Regions:
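Short, structured active-site "lid" loops
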Residues: 60-76
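Short, surface-exposed alpha-helical segments at coil->helix boundaries
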Residues: 21-29
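Short beta-strand segments enriched in small/hydrophobic residues
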Residues: 2-16
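Phosphate/pyrophosphate-binding and catalytic-coupling "lid/hinge/switch" segments at subdomain interfaces
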Residues: 14-15, 93-177
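Short beta-strand elements in bilobed, periplasmic/extracellular small-molecule ligand-binding domains
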Residues: 29-49
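Acidic, metal-coordinating catalytic cores used for nucleic-acid/nucleotide bond scission
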Residues: 12-20, 46-59, 76-89, 108-114
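Anion (oxyanion) recognition and catalysis
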Residues: 33, 66, 96-97
Length: 177
């Protein structure tokens, strides 16, 4: 029997200190309500670490349980990963080929159901060749995965720039009020 799992990830000190997983939980619970899916806390996996690697404890635990027909729901694709685009694409395609459905609430055009629907429509109507469709799908995924990778780099740069700007010339941190 197929199961639906929910994956959440936070990585910044601000997220840890303030909102935690609240925003993602609400989004996923709303999705479940709208889709008439039972939300079960036992099917929720949470990581409190960077998405720049797939070496995350809860992700590895979830991945080891996945079987063909299962679904993993994420708030958005950046919660899946922020690794380099090639590695992210390969991980996505590997899961899809295993029959795992990936749902990205805020990025529905890269959810596996939509991707498979695109391919199916193209095949049925003979609009474009299968090879061209595969290239189109690859491009669509790569654009979105590259966006989240670049977003990670920008966040990292802003954090480093902020730290550098807050330090005195002696290298000491300024004291807040």
């Amino acid at each position: 029997m197929s199961r639906t799992y929910y994956y959440m990830r936070i990585s910044t000190a601000e997220e840890r200190g303030k909102q935690k997983f609240t925003r993602q939980e609400k989004s996923i619970q709303d999705y479940c309500k709208n889709q008439n899916i039972e939300y079960d806390e036992h099917d929720v996996f949470k990581d409190d670490c960077s998405g720049k690697t797939f070496d995350r404890p809860s992700w590895k635990s979830l991945k080891s349980r996945l079987q063909a027909g299962d679904t993993v729901v994420f708030k958005d694709i950046s919660r899946f990963t922020r690794v380099d685009t090639k590695e992210a694409y390969e991980a996505y395609m590997d899961l899809m080929k295993q029959g795992i459905r990936l749902v990205f609430i805020d990025n529905p055009i890269v959810s596996t159901d939509y991707i498979q629907e695109l391919v199916g429509t193209a095949k049925k109507s003979n609009i474009i060749t299968e090879t061209a469709m595969e290239s189109t799908v690859k491009l669509l995924l790569i654009v979105e995965l590259n966006r989240v990778e670049e977003e990670r780099k920008n966040i990292s740069k802003r954090i480093k720039d902020g730290i550098a700007a807050s330090e005195k010339k002696t290298g000491e941190c300024r004291k807040g009020k």
